[in-house]
């Protein structure tokens, strides 16, 4: 009987070690975008992530990790995400994401915008608690990043929270946006201007 117990304990410990090893390996194979931008360009969806300069998990330089690639375009949000992910050296883990920025061009294309929201609701690609805002040209926001003390996603999160605290309006998070759009409730977004955003924090 004691022999069987020892074998069982050894088996359990082996499985635990295997699982721990897999988790560590999976973590090393992930990258952690802090924000996402989605816009419409020349009749197609434009999509990309914003990453921290240094990985928050292992302090790996972005160039070394080879995760910071240019935005991509495609006919649908799904095809854009697939194309972008295929260009990454690591799996994009969006659980730490702070902000989702839509472009004004996308907002004006109501059909394409509705398709994007439908895709996000069906897939759960991004956390429901991330902030959502709009920019005339989301990609222009990246041009300000070199002058920032932190990654753009974390910076925008703090900026939006400061704006809300100052009484500049109620912020929308993705979960609420998806729910209210489904119920046909009008939504008022926070609009960003690249240089104004940089000055106000």
Please report, for each region that a protein language model flagged, where it lies by residue.
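A glycine-rich, acidic short-motif signal
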Residues: 3, 17, 21-201
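Bacterial N-terminal signal peptides that target proteins for export
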Residues: 2-9
């Amino acid at each position: 009987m004691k022999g069987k117990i020892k074998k069982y304990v050894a088996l359990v410990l082996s499985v635990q070690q295997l699982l721990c090893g897999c988790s560590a390996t999976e973590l090393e194979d992930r990258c952690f975008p802090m924000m996402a931008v989605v816009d419409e360009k020349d009749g197609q969806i434009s999509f990309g992530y914003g990453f921290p300069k240094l990985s928050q998990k292992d302090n790996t330089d972005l160039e070394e990790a080879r995760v910071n690639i240019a935005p991509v375009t495609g006919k649908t949000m799904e095809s854009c995400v697939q194309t972008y992910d295929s260009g990454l050296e690591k799996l994009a883990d969006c659980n730490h994401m702070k902000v989702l920025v839509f472009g004004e061009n996308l907002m004006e294309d109501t059909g394409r915008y509705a398709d994007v929201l439908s895709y996000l609701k069906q897939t759960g690609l991004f956390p429901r608690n991330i902030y959502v805002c709009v920019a005339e040209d989301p990609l222009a926001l990246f041009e300000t990043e070199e002058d920032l003390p932190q990654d753009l996603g974390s910076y925008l999160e703090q900026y939006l929270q400061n704006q809300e605290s100052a009484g500049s309006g109620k912020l929308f998070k993705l979960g609420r946006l998806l729910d209210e759009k489904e119920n046909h409730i009008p939504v008022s977004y926070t609009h960003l201007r690249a240089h104004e955003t940089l000055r106000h924090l």
